[in-house]
Amino acid sequence: MQGLPTIILVGPMGAGKSTIGRLLAAELQREFFDSDHEIEARCGANIAWIFDVEGEAGFRDRETAMLRELASLDAVVLATGGGAVMREDNRQALRERGTVVYLATSVEQQIRRTARDRNRPLLRQGNPEQVLRDLFAKRDPLYRATADLVVRTDRRGPRAVVNEIIRRTKRLSDPLDLKA
């Protein structure tokens, strides 16, 4: 689908950024990139290992470099890591390069979606529910401040979310298009 800008998905772990991003890219006939997967491919190691060896600050440095690179591409769909909005440089780069969509979800939904995932380093730091609640309190305002659109994902299928993103992004791109 021509005419739509790069679409950048932000939101917490378990919001569906990767799943929705892949479907959205296929629907729009665009390339899809997941910044966390790109970091893993480039490093030859998973995120948990990078956190263990370099700490969160080391990972965030890699993430910032990767986001700059991926956000510079034209007309792609980009799924970011949940903590990408923690740095102002990242928020600014994302806002400047495309339409930012916050995939908002409840902590309860996050718990259901991440319960068996062992590759989430931040969830290994104590009670996962409390960690998710603390992350939500810190990050939700940043997601909202960065986003052009907020789309809820709770109790919705990925296809319905994709359709809403396309419809609302078209409306943002051309507010006079009455069919959008």
UniProtKB/Swiss-Prot annotation:
It is an enzyme of class 2 (transferase). GO terms for molecular function: ATP binding; magnesium ion binding; shikimate kinase activity. Pfam families: SKI (PF01202). ATP binds at residues 14-19, 120. Binds 1 Mg(2+) ion per subunit. Transmembrane segments: none annotated. It is found in: Cytoplasm. InterPro entries: P-loop_NTPase (IPR027417), Shikimate/glucono_kinase (IPR031322), Shikimate_kinase/TSH1 (IPR000623), Shikimate_kinase_CS (IPR023000). It catalyses: shikimate + ATP = 3-phosphoshikimate + ADP + H(+). Mg(2+) binds at residue 18. Its main location: cytoplasm. Its cofactor is Mg(2+). Substrate binds at residues 36, 60, 82, 139. HAMAP family: Shikimate_kinase. Monomer. Catalyzes the specific phosphorylation of the 3-hydroxyl group of shikimic acid using ATP as a cosubstrate. This is Shikimate kinase. The gene is aroK.
